[in-house]
């Protein structure tokens, strides 16, 4: 079990080289300029982290594990160094709460092994931006809320044939649910509107590889991979790798590879 808490007011003085203040004479003529000395007062943070790991080894080639992480963060976002406003006139704050839980199983034998894991991830982000409207009352300008829930599973296997061949395969599945809302959008008619989105998507990934190492100086491998996002499939993605030892003195090696690549837009690209 591990528990970590950290916090800081994050207040410090500094010379702001992104601003220039004018020096005036009695006739209000600029006779000089200088970089002001300021104090950062809006970058405080409070972070709490908790980690719990539990493992059980049967001593017969099987191991079971439980891992859980929790994060709670409350952070102020400081003003820009080019902002000439007063830091007491606004509040810019982001809060995060994340939980990750994983169950795992590892199975080991003389010439093969396999593993499986499944988990759940929950993340909630809250962002608030408030500003003094001039009457001493902090008025909400932005009130953004987002939630991400992900369920996933993964399985891997390795099989050895002698010392020359190694075959591997792995498959993974993710189900994402994303919800984002901004509750402080003012329409032209003066009424408040709630805008955002609620999306879900399944992502699958599978790969298989074969590695051949005829001796201790050279090795070659071929990998085939394919992925699915939503209702679309990527083309088959092949790759070939080769590496060899040119000289054992100094461990000089040569490596070469060729592959095809394909990148699909993630939910982060599309919506976050």
Descriptions of predicted regions:
Residues 1-7, 19-74, 97-109, 162, ...:
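Transmembrane beta-barrel wall of Gram-negative outer-membrane proteins
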Residues 1-7, 66-72, 116-122, 169-175, ...:
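Transmembrane beta-barrel strands of outer-membrane/channel proteins
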Residues 7, 73, 80, 85-92, ...:
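Short acidic-glycine motifs
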Residues 8-10, 73-77, 123-130, 176-183, ...:
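Sequence/structural signature of outer-membrane beta-barrel proteins
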Residues 8-9, 16-24, 71-72, 79-89, ...:
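Flexible, surface-exposed loop regions and adjacent strand-edge segments
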Residues 61-64, 111-114, 163-167, 216-220, ...:
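Repeated loop/turn-to-beta-strand initiation elements of outer-membrane beta-barrel proteins
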Residues 74, 124-126, 230-232, 236, ...:
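Surface-exposed extracellular loop regions of Gram-negative outer-membrane beta-barrel proteins
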Residues 93-100, 107-108, 118-122, 126-128, ...:
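Outer-membrane beta-barrel transmembrane domain signature of Gram-negative proteins
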């Amino acid at each position: 079990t591990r528990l970590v808490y950290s916090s800081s007011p994050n207040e410090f003085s500094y010379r702001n080289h992104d601003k220039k203040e004018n020096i005036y004479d009695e006739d209000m003529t600029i006779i000089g300029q200088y970089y002001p000395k300021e104090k950062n007062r809006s970058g405080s943070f409070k972070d709490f982290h908790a980690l719990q790991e539990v493992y059980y080894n049967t001593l017969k080639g099987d191991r079971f594990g439980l891992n859980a992480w929790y994060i709670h963060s409350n952070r102020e976002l400081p003003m820009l160094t080019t902002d000439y406003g007063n830091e007491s006139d606004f509040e810019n704050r982001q809060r995060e709460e994340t939980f990750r839980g994983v169950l795992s199983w590892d199975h080991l034998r003389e010439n093969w092994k396999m593993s499986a894991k499944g988990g759940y991830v929950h993340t909630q982000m809250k962002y608030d931006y408030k500003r003094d409207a001039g009457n001493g009352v902090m008025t909400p300008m932005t009130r953004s809320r987002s939630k991400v829930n992900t369920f996933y599973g993964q399985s891997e296997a390795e099989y050895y044939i002698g010392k020359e061949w190694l075959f591997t395969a792995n498959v993974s599945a993710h189900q994402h649910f994303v919800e984002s809302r901004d509750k402080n959008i003012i329409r032209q008619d003066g009424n408040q509107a709630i805008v955002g989105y609620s999306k879900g998507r399944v992502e699958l990934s599978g790969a298989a590889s074969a590695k051949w190492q005829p001796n201790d100086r050279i090795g070659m491998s071929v990998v085939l991979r394919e992925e699915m996002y939503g209702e679309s499939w990527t083309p088959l993605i092949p790759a070939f790798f080769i590496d060899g030892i040119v000289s054992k003195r100094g461990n000089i090696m040569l490596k070469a590879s060729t592959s095809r690549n394909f990148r699909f837009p993630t939910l982060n690209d599309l919506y976050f």
